[in-house]
UniProtKB/Swiss-Prot annotation:
Region (LID): 133-143
Family: Belongs to the adenylate kinase family. UMP-CMP kinase subfamily.
Record protein name field: UMP-CMP kinase
Cross-link Glycyl lysine isopeptide (Lys-Gly) (interchain with G-Cter in SUMO2) per UniProt, renumbered positions: K73
Protein's organism: Homo sapiens
Keyword field: Acetylation, ATP-binding, Cytoplasm, Isopeptide bond, Kinase, Nucleotide-binding, Nucleus, Phosphoprotein, Pyrimidine biosynthesis, Transferase, Ubl conjugation
Self-association and partners: Monomer.
Any one Gene Ontology molecular-function term assigned to this protein's record: nucleoside diphosphate kinase activity
Cysteine pairings via disulfide bonds: none
UniProt function note: Catalyzes the phosphorylation of pyrimidine nucleoside monophosphates at the expense of ATP. Plays an important role in de novo pyrimidine nucleotide biosynthesis. Has preference for UMP and CMP as phosphate acceptors. Also displays broad nucleoside diphosphate kinase activity.
Modified-residue entries (N6-succinyllysine), positions: K106
InterPro entries listed in its UniProt record: Adenylat/UMP-CMP_kin, Adenylat_kinase_CS, P-loop_NTPase, UMP_CMP_kinase
Domain writeup: Consists of three domains, a large central CORE domain and two small peripheral domains, NMPbind and LID, which undergo movements during catalysis. The LID domain closes over the site of phosphoryl transfer upon ATP binding. Assembling and dissambling the active center during each catalytic cycle provides an effective means to prevent ATP hydrolysis.
Cited Pfam families: ADK
Length: 196
């Protein structure tokens, strides 16, 4: 069985993580956050990638695609090796740019199927406010206004064109993420009930 993938995209603070947790609970997907995998790998003293990842994340730059894809692939392989039925994955925060997408197509072509892109559309100011709130408790070094403005710029320049590309293929499910968590999840449920 091939992994079935839903790419989850949206700016920082659009609520991707929160919604993914609910999708996992209700639909039995496995949630893979590209950012979290990179942050965990960065903390792993045995990692061959640790220092490199640290440097990129600190500078708010996008980590080389080979690293991200190898971490995603490793997780998918391990999950499916443990339980062959668990072949549905939410990949959150990836692909971030053209380079990511090309890397994915090159490495994963024929090895995984992308069902659709779940796009959480959210006003920048709302996203910033949410992240600043989260920064008080998350301990994430990149949840401060300056870093956020940079992340939103990167997102708009790099990720938005990817969403547009999938839009042309009719593969984007767009959700208004500025609403409350429950209202947003209602929209998510409508999509997953239809798409599986």
């Amino acid at each position: 069985m091939k992994p079935l993938v839903v790419f989850v995209l949206g700016g920082p603070g659009a609520g991707k993580g929160t919604q993914c947790a609910r999708i996992v609970e209700k639909y039995g997907y496995t949630h893979l956050s590209a950012g979290e995998l990179l942050r965990d790998e960065r903390k792993n003293p045995d990692s061959q990638y640790g220092e490199l990842i640290e440097k990129y994340i600190k500078e708010g730059k996008i980590v080389p695609v080979e690293i991200t894809i190898s971490l995603l692939k490793r997780e998918m392989d391990q999950t499916m090796a443990a339980n062959a039925q668990k072949n549905k994955f939410l990949i959150d925060g990836f692909p971030r740019n053209q380079d990511n997408l090309q890397g994915w197509n090159k490495t994963m072509d024929g090895k995984a199927d992308v069902s659709f892109v779940l796009f959480f559309d959210c006003n920048n100011e709302i996203c910033i406010e949410r992240c600043l709130e989260r920064g008080k408790s998350s301990g994430r070094s990149d949840d401060n206004r300056e870093s956020l403005e940079k992340r939103i710029q990167t997102y708009l320049q790099s990720t938005k064109p990817i969403i547009d590309l999938y839009e042309e293929m009719g593969k984007v499910k767009k959700i208004d993420a500025s609403k409350s968590v429950d209202e947003v999840f209602d929209e998510v449920v409508q999509i997953f009930d239809k798409e599986g």
